[in-house]
From Swiss-Prot:
Residues 105-149 are annotated as: Disordered. One of its GO terms (biological process) is altruistic, chimeric sorocarp development. Its EC number is 2.7.11.-. Residues 105-119 have a biased composition (Polar residues). This is Probable serine/threonine-protein kinase abkD.
Length: 695
């Protein structure tokens, strides 16, 4: 097919005339004539050429025509009336000659450019996003803090239109929304009215956990803020006192609100008056016997579940109001049918139900403390606390402990254990003999009975040392609320110590008892080699740090082991060393055998009570004598004259040494008191404090 000459167009006289596209006709012609019509019509910028090409693929030809077809937008005035009849006849004859079908003059449709590919779109979007980010960064650099705050508020504040949209959505689904609210309210009421149910227990755990987390968060924030104040500055002391008091108030409120195991933890914190600031010990001391008490209907429910009848079935008189409320139970005064006055200890009805949740909360709190203060790592305490409390929640176990302790101390007239009434006792109810007396730390009440606090402290120390060093069956929770003082029934001018609450005891084997006796005796005598030997025998490798924890003084630098006071230099060295070696202390406590932890607890409580009584006795000398007595009691069992003679020799030498130390410190204290009276030494308060340091 020959190329048509463009001279045909010159015959058209109109300047703006454009030949209308033959696109459809050409496509049909090519489809009908695969071999004859070998031309391809191309239009470009008001020019069209017929190219001679071999067309073997119809689809390719169609695509080529679609791609090359183009009409310039500058020529939009192609009208059918602008074409002369002669021109129409010419093109129609041309169409017939080359089988181009009918010729129609229609208004041309504009062709659309090929849309960009997906990759190109992604690249364009990425470029736009990068440009937007760069613009935002440039704008944010120019913005002030007020502008940023204003932008945040604009994003967070709900506009009126958004509020209307929320109301509209609520109006559409108001039935479902109201039903959900009513269901939630009903679930809360059901949980409150039925605390023993599954939902009630879960709701109680969640609420108690929330209170504990809230309290812990506030305390950690307070101490974090305090840490930014220089310790040597004048304002640090004032801020620290305020921080201690606020934290103690928060803990007290948490313990009173949650009750149960939280009060138990608060009691232990209150006993650490030789370690913690006075704000803690003074604030939390009310938890020892002034915990919140429960309503009488809870007491009746426990009686009905455990014994089968109400209290009035077993007692002729039963006080509805408790005389004391402790961490795990409250005590009521009652009179049996036989006329005996008894104390009825009733466990809180929800204590066992909340036990697992409180232990879980305890674990979380220790984890948070470890995260906020990395030097503290006491997560291992949770499992030990759980094992101890499981035994303490069983009052039948407490009754067994009380009867065994009474048998061990039967030869000691200065100690008394109340008698247990088994018919009126169960796992959650314990009925014992009622004792009239005062708390051991109530100095005024002790003096009003005509007794001496020095004698009271000495009797108490001797009783506890007898349990530790001789019987190896130890009351490990002897805080002031569990120890009463009364006039001796046979000797009214002498005190008698009454031990209460025997739920937490620890029994030690004979090997441990002998090793601990040797350890304490050599601690007092400052025999380093033997202290190291018996510390390792007890399972403690770091014997120096262990000795410091027992004596609460720098053992390595102590010149005399019997001093009941501690110098300011020793105290400062002890505290600074404890702070620097806090991680070592944590590691030691973590690796220490668990039975030693309870001994340390007992030791701290003895120190605490001695301090509250004014440190009238030297507890080191008392404990050293009973340690030697415990060793002698073992040697007397063995048949051997040489062993007996050697033990007597050791006892005499120890007694001579103890008497010498006691006389030395007696004269030192007398001289100091005379200097104070003569006003030769002015800082009287400082001297007295040094004499009472660490009991």
């Amino acid at each position: 097919m020959k190329i048509l000459k463009f001279s045909l167009l010159s015959k058209l006289k109109h300047k703006d005339f454009i030949v209308t596209s033959f696109r459809n006709n050409i496509i049909n012609s090519i489809k009908n004539n695969n071999t004859n019509n070998n031309g391809l019509l191309k239009f470009s910028n008001n020019k069209y050429n017929f190219l001679n090409n071999n067309n073997n693929n119809n689809n390719n030809n169609v695509n080529k025509i679609n791609n090359v077809y183009y009409i310039n937008n500058n020529f939009k005035n192609v009208m059918e009336n602008k074409i002369k009849p002669s021109s129409i006849q010419f093109f129609s004859s041309l169409s017939n000659k080359y089988n181009l079908n009918s010729f129609t003059t229609t208004k041309p449709q504009p062709c659309q450019a090929k849309p960009p590919s997906s990759k190109q779109q992604q690249q364009q979007q990425q470029q736009q996003q990068q440009q937007q980010q760069q613009q935002q960064q440039q704008q944010s650099k120019k913005k002030t803090s007020k502008d940023r705050l204003r932008d945040i508020l604009k994003k967070t504040v709900i506009t009126p239109q958004e509020f209307l949209n929320v109301l509209q959505r609520f109006a559409k689904n108001y039935k479902k929304t109201i039903a959900s609210i009513l269901a939630a309210i009903a679930l809360i009421i059901y949980s409150y009215e039925t605390p023993d149910s599954y939902f009630g227990s879960m709701m109680n755990v969640i609420v108690r956990f929330y209170r504990a987390m809230k309290c812990a968060t506030k305390i950690m924030i307070n101490y974090k803020i305090l840490s930014y104040t220089p310790e040597k500055s004048s304002e640090y002391l004032e801020k620290s006192k305020i921080c201690h008091q606020e934290s103690a108030d928060l803990i007290l409120d948490l313990c009173l609100t949650n009750g149960g195991l939280y009060i138990k933890a608060g009691q232990y914190i209150a006993s650490l008056n030789h370690i913690l600031p006075i704000q803690y010990t003074k604030t939390l001391s009310v938890l020892q016997d002034q915990a919140p008490w429960r309503d009488f209907y809870e007491v009746e429910s426990v009686f009905l579940k455990d014994l089968g009848n109400a209290p009035n079935h077993y007692f002729s008189d039963f006080d509805r109001l408790p005389i004391a409320a402790a961490s795990l139970a409250q005590v009521h005064r009652a009179i049996t049918k036989e006329g005996e006055e008894v104390a009825v200890k009733v466990q809180y009805v929800d204590l066992q139900r909340n036990f697992d949740g409180d232990i879980f909360t305890h674990n979380v709190l220790l984890t948070l403390v470890n995260m906020a203060f990395p030097d503290f790592e006491f997560n291992w305490m949770a499992e030990e606390m759980k094992n101890v409390l499981i035994k303490e929640l069983d009052f039948s176990q407490e009754a067994d402990n009380a009867e065994r302790a009474a048998q061990d101390l039967s030869s000691n007239n200065n100690a008394y254990i109340p008698k247990v009434f088994r018919p009126y006792s169960s796992k959650r109810i314990l009925t014992t003999e009622f004792i009239h007396g005062c708390k051991i730390n109530n100095v005024q009440a002790i003096r009003s009975m005509g007794l001496s606090e020095k004698t009271v402290s000495q009797r108490f120390m001797e009783i506890m040392c007898e349990q530790i060093f001789i019987h190896a069956f130890v009351h490990v929770d002897p805080h002031a609320g569990n120890v009463l003082v009364r006039q001796h029934p046979n000797h009214p001018n002498q005190p008698q110590i009454v031990l209460l609450d025997h739920g937490l005891y620890r029994e030690y084997d004979e090997e441990f008892r002998l090793n601990f006796c040797n350890l304490y005796k050599n601690l007092v005598l400052c025999n380093n080699k033997k202290v190291e030997k018996y510390s390792k025998a007890l399972g403690v490798q770091n014997w120096k740090l262990f000795s410091t924890m027992i004596l609460m003084r720098n053992f390595e630098g102590s010149s005399v082991g019997l001093s009941n006071s501690i110098s300011s230099e020793e105290l400062e060295k002890l505290l600074s060393g404890a702070i620097e070696r806090l991680k070592d202390i944590n590691l030691l406590m973590k690796a220490m055998p668990r039975h030693l932890l309870l001994i340390l607890r007992n030791n701290n409580l003895l120190r605490s009570i001695n301090m509250e009584l004014g440190s009238p006795v030297n507890r080191f000398s008392i404990m050293a004598r009973y340690a030697a007595k415990g060793l002698n009691s073992n040697s007397s069992k063995n048949s051997g004259i040489i062993r007996l003679v050697k033990s007597v020799e050791e006892k005499v030498s120890l007694e001579v040494m103890l008497k010498g130390y006691e006389l030395y410190y007696y004269f030192v204290n007398r001289i100091l008191s005379i200097l104070i009276r003569l006003h030769i030494i002015n800082p009287e308060k400082l001297i007295k404090d040094q004499m009472k340091k660490l009991g």
